[in-house]
Amino acid sequence: MIHYPATAQSQFEAQGLGYIPMVIEQSGRGERSYDIYSRLLKERIIFLVGPVNDATANLVVAQLLFLEAENPDKDIYFYINSPGGSVTAGMGIYDTMQFVKPDVSTLCVGQAASMGALLLAAGAQGKRFCLPNSRVMIHQPLGGFQGQASDIEIHAKEILFLREKLNHILASHTGQPVEKIALDTDRDNFMSAEQSVAYGIVDKVIASRADAA
C-alpha cells in the first residue's frame, strides 16, 4: 500500500476513542441518546480524528454523501485532527469533497499532517480555517515494497505518479507553483497556523466562532 507517511503519533490509534461519550436529548417525544459524533453530524459537523485509512475514509465519505442528501445547499463543516495516512483512502475523501454540492468548510484542530494537510487545503475557498495552536505538515508520499526487481520498478513508478498528482492538487488549492510544492514537500515541512495561511493551505486563523463569520 502506498501512503503518505504519518507522523510518529500515527503508530498508535487516536487516544480516548475506546469510550465515546453519549448525549441525551429531551424532546416532546421523550429522551433520545446519541453518541457524540452522531450528535455533531446533526449540526453538519464531520470530525476526522486519527490516521486516514480505509475505515475512516469510508465513514467520512458516507457522512459527506448523507449531509448532501439532507440539504444540498447548506455548508458541511469538516474538522480535522489527523497525522495523515493512506493516499488512496485520503483521495477518496478528497474526491467526495469536490463531488458533493455543498461547500465543505475545513478546520484544523490540533494537527493536519500529510494527507490531513491536503484535505485541509481542499476545503471551499474562503472557508478553510486553523485554530491558533494548530500545526500543519506537508511532505511527499512514502511507499515500501519487497519482491522482484520488475515489481519494485512498477511500485516506484506508482509512487512517483502519485507524488506528481498530489503536488498538482496541493498547488491548485494553495496557489503555489508546482515546482515550489515539489521542493517544499521533499522533506517534512512543518508550519504554524499563521504560516499555513501565508502558504495558502488555509484562509484564516480563528480563535472563536465569531472569527469565522
From Swiss-Prot:
GO CC annotations, alphabetized: cytoplasm; endopeptidase Clp complex
- Localization terms from the record: Cytoplasm
Q: Does the keyword ATP-binding apply?
A: no
- Which InterPro entries did the record assign? ClpP (IPR001907), ClpP/crotonase-like_dom_sf (IPR029045), ClpP/TepA (IPR023562), ClpP_His_AS (IPR033135), ClpP_Ser_AS (IPR018215)
For molecular function, the Gene Ontology terms on record are: ATP-dependent peptidase activity; ATPase binding; serine-type endopeptidase activity
Concerning Gene3D superfamilies, the annotation shows:
2-enoyl-CoA Hydratase, Chain A, domain 1
Sorted alphabetically, the keyword list is:
Cytoplasm, Hydrolase, Protease, Serine protease
Catalysed reactions, as listed in the record: Hydrolysis of proteins to small peptides in the presence of ATP and magnesium. alpha-casein is the usual test substrate. In the absence of ATP, only oligopeptides shorter than five residues are hydrolyzed (such as succinyl-Leu-Tyr-|-NHMec, and Leu-Tyr-Leu-|-Tyr-Trp, in which cleavage of the -Tyr-|-Leu- and -Tyr-|-Trp bonds also occurs)
In terms of CDD domains, this protein maps to:
S14_ClpP_2 (cd07017)
Active site residues according to the UniProt entry: S114, H139
Top EC category = hydrolase
Q: Which GO terms describe its biological process?
A: protein quality control for misfolded or incompletely synthesized proteins
- Entry EC no(s): 3.4.21.92
- What top-level branch of life does the organism fall under? Bacteria
Task: Explain the purpose of this protein.
Answer: Cleaves peptides in various proteins in a process that requires ATP hydrolysis. Has a chymotrypsin-like activity. Plays a major role in the degradation of misfolded proteins.
Q: How does it assemble?
A: Fourteen ClpP subunits assemble into 2 heptameric rings which stack back to back to give a disk-like structure with a central cavity, resembling the structure of eukaryotic proteasomes.
- Alphabetized HAMAP family for the sequence: ClpP (MF_00444)
Q: State the similarity comment.
A: Belongs to the peptidase S14 family.
Give the PANTHER family listed for this entry.
ATP-DEPENDENT CLP PROTEASE PROTEOLYTIC SUBUNIT (PTHR10381:SF70)
This chain belongs to which protein, by name? ATP-dependent Clp protease proteolytic subunit
Q: In which organism is this protein found?
A: Methylobacillus flagellatus (strain ATCC 51484 / DSM 6875 / VKM B-1610 / KT)
